């Protein structure tokens, strides 16, 4: 609206032939222009005195930020669970889902998904805490706390859902992922030598619009541990550009996948890949960017390729 007032005022104050009453009208439009400018332009007429501005930085100490973050995790998870996942529609119930057997619902891919979620939640939490001024050790502990809080809140909430239920196998996987990342954060040598990654390329069901949630698109996912060769004594060799990988994925377990796969299959694998963090380092990428690819595997940069 201030732009409209300015345009109208300028059109009225421009020289032109007009009746004698026009100047009065122009004064009203000019007044509108002044009001619009003083209310729309910061620091011209309505800037508060310095003493009137609350010092939020002094209030938001790193401790308060940590409390707010973890309270926000619980609140956001609860809100989403009650509105989207049907939490609270039944009493609490637990069930065993098994691990990696052929007769399980997802062939064990979901267990690696839980572990990966715990790992990434811990890494992201620790990064936030470091930014807020915590040292490496304290940030790692708080990151692990946030990772446990997030994954446990989801799993306990699932216990009150008519569809999912609480699974001890899921919770063990959650804690394993949190614990693994905590150890990586506390021990730089381990962090250099082992990366836990997710590789994703949309499955046929997603590409054809039959499924939308990529986090449960197990036929498009696989998870792996990568061992960069440069961290295992080969830093001066041309082999430093490569890494050994051990991983697992499944295909065709979901009903939506039946038309695209002839059978449900599990795919453990051992392979070799390009060490992307080193490539990025040579191109001048910062540490933050390189850390992302400690957790993400780019499709097509490792063999064997997914089935």
Q: Residue ranges of each PLM-predicted region?
A:
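Transmembrane beta-strands of outer-membrane beta-barrel proteins
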Residues: 150, 192-196, 240-246, 270
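Interfacial helix-loop-helix junctions of multi-pass membrane proteins
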Residues: 153-175
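N-terminal secretory signal peptides that target proteins for export/translocation
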Residues: 1-25
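Residues that define the transmembrane beta-barrel architecture of outer-membrane proteins
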Residues: 174, 217-223, 264-268
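Primarily interfacial, aromatic-capped hydrophobic alpha-helices that serve as membrane anchors
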Residues: 184-233
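N-terminal targeting leaders of membrane proteins
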Residues: 20-23, 31-111, 115-134, 237-240, ...
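Transmembrane beta-strands of outer-membrane beta-barrel pores
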Residues: 200-204, 231, 248-252, 276-278
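Residues on the lipid-exposed face of transmembrane beta-strands in outer-membrane beta-barrel proteins
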Residues: 179-183, 223-229, 270-276
């Amino acid at each position: 609206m201030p732009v409209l007032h300015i345009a109208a005022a300028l059109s009225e104050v421009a020289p032109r032939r007009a009746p004698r009453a026009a100047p009065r009208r122009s004064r009203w439009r000019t007044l509108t222009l002044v009001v619009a400018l003083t209310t729309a332009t910061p620091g011209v007429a309505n800037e508060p005195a310095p003493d009137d501005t609350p010092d939020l930085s002094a209030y938001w100490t790193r401790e308060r930020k940590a409390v707010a973050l973890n309270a926000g995790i619980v609140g956001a998870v609860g809100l989403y669970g009650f509105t989207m996942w049907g939490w609270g529609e039944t009493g609490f119930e637990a069930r065993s889902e098994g691990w990696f057997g052929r007769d399980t619902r997802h062939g064990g891919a979901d267990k690696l998904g839980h572990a990966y979620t715990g790992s990434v939640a811990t890494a992201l939490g620790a990064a936030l805490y470091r930014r807020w001024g915590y040292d490496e050790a304290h940030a790692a502990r708080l990151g692990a706390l946030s990772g446990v809080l997030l994954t446990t809140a989801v799993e306990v909430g699932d216990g009150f859902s008519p569809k999912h239920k609480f699974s001890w196998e899921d919770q063990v996987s959650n804690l394993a992922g949190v614990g693994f990342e905590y150890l990586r954060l506390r021990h730089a040598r381990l962090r250099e030598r082992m990366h836990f990654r997710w590789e994703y390329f949309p499955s046929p069901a997603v590409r054809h619009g039959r499924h939308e949630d990529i986090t449960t698109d197990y036929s498009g996912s696989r998870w792996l541990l990568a061992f960069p060769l440069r961290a295992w004594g080969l830093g001066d060799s041309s082999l430093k550009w490569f890494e050994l990988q051990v991983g697992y994925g499944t295909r065709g377990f979901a009903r939506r996948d039946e038309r695209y796969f002839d059978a449900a299959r599990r795919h453990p694998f051992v392979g070799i890949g390009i060490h992307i963090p080193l490539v990025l380092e040579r191109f001048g990428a910062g540490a933050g960017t390189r850390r992302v690819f400690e957790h993400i595997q780019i499709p097509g940069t490792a063999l064997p390729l997914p089935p």
